Amino acid sequence: MNLNSIPAFQDNYIWVLTNDEGRCVIVDPGEAAPVLKAIAEHKWMPEAIFLTHHHHDHVGGVKELLQHFPQMTVYGPAETQDKGATHLVGDGDTIRVLGEKFTLFATPGHTLGHVCYFSHPYLFCGDTLFSGGCGRLFEGTPSQMYQSLMKINSLPDDTLICCAHEYTLANIKFALSILPHDSFINEYYRKVKELRVKKQMTLPVILKNERKINLFLRTEDIDLINEINKETILQQPEARFAWLRSKKDTF
């Protein structure tokens, strides 16, 4: 399997997973034009679309792509039924695409019906987890999002996090505003800044490293707890997550 990315809009990535025969699955095509261009250039043969949630920048290109490739199966949660999904999927489902098995798990928070697709080592997590951050809570609660992130955090160390936006630099700046002396985050910031100056992408990221730079995955880390305790004493990891999310919302 080969992982490819297509830039879209200002900071979206549309992921395309291909096999050796050129058959492919397209993840969250927010617009059709760049996908159609890439398909023509690489001579890919689209077999399926994965949708993680219903937001327009993730589903906007589905119907046009289906006009060109009506044989495609479009997998998505119930909230994407009116966005072009032909096969509804949910927590615990498994599907076979490109000869590979993908496991789905519900990750409510950003939206209530958000799902992720996992076939080791690839995790397509939409707007649940970003490198250095997590999605805004447009529909769900902090508790829901925390539990969703813990599902992701339980995956193997070598999982490749394929999130949908290039938010890494801004997220690392936020992390440093909370833990300014964290050596790993500081070093990672320098690397990410250099990549972005060169207009290179920072994704995908390996989960083992993400656990070190993403404060939303470090709610039981003593350094973070000590920093939060300077402002307020929060006993539960979920409460510390909610505190972080509130801080990020106004950062």
From Swiss-Prot:
EC code(s) of this entry: 3.1.2.6
EC class name: hydrolase
Entry-linked Gene3D superfamilies: Ribonuclease Z/Hydroxyacylglutathione hydrolase-like (3.60.15.10)
Residues annotated for Zn(2+) 2 binding in this entry: D57, H58, D127, H165
Cofactor binding mode and count: Binds 2 Zn(2+) ions per subunit.
CDD domains referenced in this protein's UniProt entry, alphabetically: hydroxyacylglutathione_hydrolase_MBL-fold
GO terms (BP aspect): methylglyoxal catabolic process to D-lactate via S-lactoyl-glutathione
Binding site for Zn(2+) 1: H53, H55, H110, D127
GO molecular function: hydroxyacylglutathione hydrolase activity; metal ion binding
Function: Thiolesterase that catalyzes the hydrolysis of S-D-lactoyl-glutathione to form glutathione and D-lactic acid.
SUBUNIT field: Monomer.
PANTHER family in the cross-refs: HYDROXYACYLGLUTATHIONE HYDROLASE (PTHR43705), HYDROXYACYLGLUTATHIONE HYDROLASE GLOB (PTHR43705:SF1)
Protein name: Hydroxyacylglutathione hydrolase
Protein's gene: gloB
